[in-house]
Amino acid sequence: NTQAFMDYGKVSRRWMMPAKYYTKVFDHKGTAIRVIFLDTTPLIDSYRKNQEIYPDACKQDAEAQLSWLDETLKNAKEDWVIVVGHHPIYAYTTKKENERLDMQKRLLPILHKYNNVAIYACGHIHNFQHIQKKGDNIDYVVNSSSSLARPVKPIDGTVFCSPADGFSVFTADKKQLRM
């Protein structure tokens, strides 16, 4: 229930999820980073078609979110732009390939359109992966979790992969975005 997560922000100062998709700019010592948070579930066809398991995805207008993303990226002037979604665009996984193909079909044209996205970060498959596709300026980062770790192996473009649990830390200045 996505609405429950948004409502929880009204009772806890430590939780902030103002909408199903939103953006936030972090500015520190003159370096600005725009983080764009997406709800990727409605971007996957099989989720939108399964009202019993994914009722939130069935009710959402995926095209409205994609239009919002396009407009947000068009106007993004920060030093760095990171897009965050739950589902991977590229990754080694035993999960259904159609999920990644749907993400590639819907997100990649927009992410590449303004040439300003540095990283697409996600989770969903419970391991670490850093993928750089040849000819693509975006780094694709899959984050693990602390509750479950799944096996992983390199795919085309893999820079790093590990089944360890944990999280990623990013630091930035005007010249470099480091992970």
Regions found by a protein language model. Give the residues of each.
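Histidine-centered catalytic micro-motifs
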Residues: 84-90, 120-128
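Short acidic, glycine-rich surface-loop motifs adjacent to enzyme active sites
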Residues: 76-94
